[in-house]
């Protein structure tokens, strides 16, 4: 049988939501930890610590949302020095990336011998993404990684269906994530609910902790959080995110929409046509730009590609070549607009160029970022 589903780059989705929040006045702090939370008169006294400098700052908040994911219960225990009201059950899922197993843009849903379903999904242009596993996790969250038995498990199911047989040497990359589910004693990990739960803290000032949830429901989850906090913010407006494109996705504003809102009835075909229109416009504006680079920029940044391209009038305006098709102009953009601070931010969290850039390129990129950040710090001082 055949059905339709959606695919998203989760790390870029997070960044784009942060960008949209900043556009609406949010103060976005990356690499910043909440180290203390004290209840004051009508507000929380929040102590924040910046990771690289260790500098602490105290801010006041009318409400706090604990959206720490798998750290949700640990954070509560750390801040209040007592066991949180709900326990979390951590379930790890891992994926492997291998050379492309099949042609076409369809994904495959395979059933393993244990009855579990595994997906094989076209990934970037040259790879297949295989996953996910599912297992209880009691390790160190900061160093979560795939186990060899998980790799063997995923290879086994793929080899049971595809003519091209995989070996351990075919695994190009791996990644693992941990779901913070509510602990339902006695239930197998595969049976525990994936639904989200909002748990209010017993305090006069609102503190809401989020348990569970998944990327497909993140927006409605956020709306439910805001609904719960509405009494604290009486001037809060009506929900608006359903019809609001994320940064880079406002094609309808340029090609027939109004007020930056999505046009009702616009489908994937219309969006693809809009992207093709913008691609043609930018190709005419910058005929010197490599077709493959423009394609990647459009897929990654959408309409923000125009901001990235800016007033560049030749290939030399792209700046230093840092490996693959990464130039310093893009790195500067990511530092200025997407809070990138280190090579992993650039190569894995904002793009997926980590698959293409060699160790020398990574070292050159690290040196460049260090130089840019040092110059920025000197200028700020």
Describe the residue ranges of each PLM region.
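A conserved short coil-to-beta-strand element within the FAD-binding core of flavoproteins
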Residues: 30-44
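Core beta-strand elements of the Rossmann-like FAD/NAD(P) dinucleotide-binding domain
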Residues: 54-63
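Rossmann-like flavin
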Residues: 1-25
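General small-molecule cofactor/ligand-binding pocket signal
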Residues: 27-29, 172
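Flavin (primarily FAD) binding-site architecture
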Residues: 66-81
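C-terminal amphipathic alpha-helical interaction region
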Residues: 355-360, 364, 374-381
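C-terminal catalytic lobe of FAD-dependent flavoproteins
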Residues: 10-12, 20, 80, 85-90, ...
